[in-house]
Amino acid sequence: GHDEDIDDLSPAGFDAHVDLARRTLERLSEVEPTDAIDEVTIAAMRERLGLQLETADAGWDRAALNNLASPVQGCRDIFDLMPTDTAEQWATIATRMGKVPAALEQLKVTLAESTDRGVVSSRRGVQACIDQCAEFTSPDGYYAGLLAGAKLSDGSPLPQEVAADLRTNVEAAAAAYRSLGEWLEERVLPHAPAADAAGRDRYALASRDFLGATVDLEETYQWGQEELARITADMEATAQRIRPGATVAEAIAHLKADPAYQLHGTDELKAWMQGKADEAIAMLHGTHFDIPEPAHRIECLIAPTHTGGIYYTGP
């Protein structure tokens, strides 16, 4: 029911998320679990929602700027999974696209408040967003490609009214992203710290976000250094097996030059990924895991942009 909408990125929107998390936690305190599933669910919700509130208290929930998972990408990535078969579906895309400019203006207000409080992402993270804004809106970027490839599933053109709305709103969204990039460069980048290191307090929050657990950071770093040394030694030994006397870089170059390990074009890459995914499901299902039917097919796709990296969306 919200396919035409975009999240509220204003300070009030972030406040609403925090308020919902706080009210949900209060209601959880009144819930009595009836079985082990309830116990696990309640514990997981308390951990996630509690961490959300801690992150909000530190101000980092509304200051995120990076190359992969921040509102700068979210306002564009949201269109990747929208169906594009029918005129009605394209009309929905056009309507949602028309809301991008307002969302990015809201984001500016939120980021300005965070910047004024001294809560700013690293310079490299801010610069990555600036670069992506330019890439999205370039002559061969995402928005130009979306307009050029807009057609129905049977290959026929969009109805004239839908096509006109789409063009108007895509051009407005592109203009909004250009404006955002310029604004970030002028308003946020000068205040962004040059160091990538986030600091212990922020790192502790982020590690809990990714791990779902609190770990001893010193012990974890020591383990990480040991693992890095082990992997480095393994890489060097493997390089010798591939080509005696070769460094790791030379062994990689040797493999890249071998036609047996080459893929040409996105179609070959997509087919290779799909084959590996299907093979993995076939090997694991019924032997190591009972994989539900909706997850039997992992659809491998090539994202319309070349920013960020590989990502997965649930079924």
Protein language model regions, located:
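N-terminal maturation segment of proteins
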Residues: 1-315
